[in-house]
Amino acid sequence: MPFLKVDKGLAEQMSGVQVMRPMPNLDLLLDKAKKYPIFGTKMRSVIYEPSLDGIEKVVQQQFDVAKQIISKGFMPIIEPEVNIDSAEKHECELLLKADILRNLDRLNDDHQVMLKLTLPEEDGFYQELIDHPKVLKVVALSGGYSRQDACDKLEENPGMIASFSRAFTEGLSKQQSDKEFADTIDASIDKIYKASQI
């Protein structure tokens, strides 16, 4: 299912977060995207510290852009990544979930979004988001966890499905033969798929 990356990268870190850089040409990009079989969009911010002001800015920006994307007929993936090396990762997740819920409740009844979130410290932590009527799907990003750790965490969070890139490519090398490369890819797909089925 095709998704279009629409963000222009991250701004400098302030208030414990990195918001997205401005996207002045987003409407033009989305109008061009209508010519292709694109289902939705993706855009990433990063949270490092449990800063109430910083996390509110991240979530507000993500939802503001998401509404713009919905108005053009696409499904937005909202991706406020919590850095896995944060010393206060769970505290970040508590603030993030509360702010996402507030913004979901403000969406029009006929609007839905997808959420792409870092695997949480607490098992089943995002169940309330998974069950929310304005959320189409909650997908998990590996965020730098090893494939094994990411899959283990995913198994403890039923309802989330994998959207791993870093964990997926773990073990791949240009020095591998075609068979070794294909075998590594197959093993990665199998492991991640099984973890998503729990």
Regions found by a protein language model. Give the residues of each.
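Catalytic beta/alpha-barrel core
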Residues: 5, 42-44, 54, 88-121, ...
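Acidic (Asp/Glu)-rich catalytic clusters
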Residues: 1, 27-37, 67-73, 105-108, ...
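Short, proline-centered helix/strand-breaking motifs
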Residues: 75-76, 137
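Active-site beta->alpha loop and helix N-cap motifs at the rims of alpha/beta catalytic domains
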Residues: 1-57
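Active-site beta-loop-alpha junctions enriched in small/polar residues
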Residues: 5-11, 44-48, 79-85, 116-122, ...
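Alpha-helical scaffolding segments of alpha/beta enzyme cores, especially the outer helices
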Residues: 28-31, 57-71, 94-103, 124, ...
